[in-house]
């Protein structure tokens, strides 16, 4: 099959006709299928073992659990999984890409949708209709620009000073309490449950476009995002924790940022343990030497993740399929 295939849609509404629906993990009991995987092989058995590690994290009352999000699973139908992890006290803090939090979660909180599409669609035709593609998922670019502008409008109303991404996202949560079109977003749920969200590469998203417009309108009195203070804030959470565990979706900046808190604490002269538990769900190949694909065993050589607890490194797509 060729790389592109014209599906003969000729109007925007034809492309944006089938919404992505987010899976509701509270609507069924997955424990039996997960436990049955213990006797299987490959990713199935790894999934069952990862589940055991996560259950250990939850049972460990001294463990601070960090959820990291990278990639586009939020747009693909997994957003409510992460929301419910916050809602049911299964995570204590989140480190994510700006795209996961703003372009996907905040975007839907404003009432917009992601749509089922095709990876074979002619991308020139999509561009002609102002539609963005994430593999087989479509986004209305006009709606995404509303998201950009809304971020700028939120910034316009804040006191002009420096904010960490956590502080700014908290302001977004406050905004959503009265302005959301879709209730129960990850941002709003985290706001309600006092769970901090950090986006170390915050401006690499719709937030960046919105904040650039904000600064253009307010050249002398505007907000800024202080990523250094943000790193210190996250490190302080690690320092104050008796133990910690990582549940990592994808890799990238969020993965490295949370792991580096151990090194930062050491450089500040603090005696902290490495992350005790770690699970990574990814499709990256460790042979390319990239951060996203690096194994958790490799992270132990940097002093980031302890090897005393079994760690699991899983393929993202099969795990979410199960």
Please describe what each predicted stretch is:
Residues 125-207:
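Ligand-binding beta-strand-loop-alpha-helix segment within the catalytic cores
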């Amino acid at each position: 099959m060729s790389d592109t295939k014209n599906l003969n849609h000729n109007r925007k509404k034809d492309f944006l006709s089938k919404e992505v629906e987010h899976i509701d993990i509270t609507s069924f009991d997955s424990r039996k299928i997960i436990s049955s995987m213990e006797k299987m092989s490959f990713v199935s058995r790894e999934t069952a073992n990862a589940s055991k590690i996560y259950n250990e994290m939850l049972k460990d009352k001294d463990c601070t659990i960090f959820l990291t999000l990278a990639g586009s699973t939020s747009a693909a139908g997994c957003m409510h999984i992460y929301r419910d992890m916050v809602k049911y006290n299964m995570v204590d803090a989140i480190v994510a890409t700006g795209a996961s939090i703003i372009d996907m979660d905040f975007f839907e909180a404003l009432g917009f949708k992601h749509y089922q599409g095709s990876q074979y669609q002619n991308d020139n035709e999509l561009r002609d209709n102002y539609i963005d593609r994430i593999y087989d998922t479509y986004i209305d670019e006009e709606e995404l620009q509303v998201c950009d502008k809304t971020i700028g409008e939120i910034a316009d109303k804040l006191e002009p000073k420096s904010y960490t991404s956590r502080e700014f996202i908290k302001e977004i949560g406050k905004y959503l309490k009265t302005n959301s079109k879709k209730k129960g977003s990850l941002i709003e749920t985290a706001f309600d449950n006092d769970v901090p969200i950090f986006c170390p590469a915050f401006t690499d998203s719709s937030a960046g476009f919105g904040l650039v417009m904000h600064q253009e309108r307010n050249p002398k009195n505007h907000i800024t995002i202080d990523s250094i203070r943000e790193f210190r804030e996250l490190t302080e959470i690690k320092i104050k924790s008796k133990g910690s565990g990582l549940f990592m979706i994808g890799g990238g900046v969020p993965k490295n940022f949370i792991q580096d808190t151990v090194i930062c604490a050491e450089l500040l002269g603090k005696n902290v343990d490495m992350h005790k538990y770690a699970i990574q769900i990814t499709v990256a190949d460790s042979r390319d030497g990239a951060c996203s694909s690096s194994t958790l065993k490799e992270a132990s050589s940097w002093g980031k993740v302890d090897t005393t607890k079994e760690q699991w490194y899983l393929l993202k797509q099969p795990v979410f399929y199960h």
